[in-house]
Amino acid sequence: MLEGFQILVQNTVQGTIHKIKCVCDSQMSVSEMSCSESTSACQSLEDGSVPEILISLLYNATNGRLSAEVIKGSHLKNWAANRPPNTYVKLTLRKSTDQEMSKCKISIRRGRPNPVYKETFVFKVTLFQLSHVTLMLSVYNKSSMRRKMIGWIYLGLNSSGEELNHWTEMKESKGRQVRRWQALLESR
């Protein structure tokens, strides 16, 4: 059972830090996170036909923090118009019972098929809970009238294939960031 959790959002593009407290007892600063920047170059998985998202995962077992950095998107399309999309990403953390624990949203990146997000979300999740949660990332195109989902992925309990490999490697990495391109499951 999750006692409480806290989310820190750092927008590294604009240099601002936002704290969102959700059913929590304590505050934490970004300086308390032990994130190490990966020096390896990451290349997109696909040739341009599939929308993708570059995600970095980190779990710190010492303080029970799950960090998910949404770095950038690639080949995101605007199905409704012949212009680049205005995109944002929504992260939803769910228990094994499919009960929503938390949701957060990245600010909109306007007119970019390959947007750079560089926003980090930190969730408090104990080590024994880590195998029983799912992180869903949904990418949306926002127009003046409505929003349309471009695609989504699951990481964690309800994932498979490359998404499950990413999650498993993060759990076994002993506090090291694990970056991967993930192909979005398209929603038309």
UniProtKB/Swiss-Prot annotation:
Record-linked Gene3D superfamilies: C2 domain
One protein family per Pfam: C2
InterPro entries (alphabetical): C2_dom (IPR000008), C2_domain_sf (IPR035892), SYT14/14L/16 (IPR043541)
Gene Ontology BP terms: cell differentiation; positive regulation of CREB transcription factor activity; positive regulation of dendrite extension; positive regulation of ERK1 and ERK2 cascade
Induction: Up-regulated during neutrophil differentiation.
GO molecular function: phospholipid binding
Its job: Plays a role in melanocyte differentiation; enhances dendrite outgrowth, melanin content and tyrosinase activity through the modulation of ERK and/or CREB pathways.
Family: Belongs to the synaptotagmin family.
Name assigned to this protein: Putative synaptotagmin-14-like protein
Native organism: Homo sapiens
Organism placement in taxonomy: Eukaryota, Metazoa, Chordata, Craniata, Vertebrata
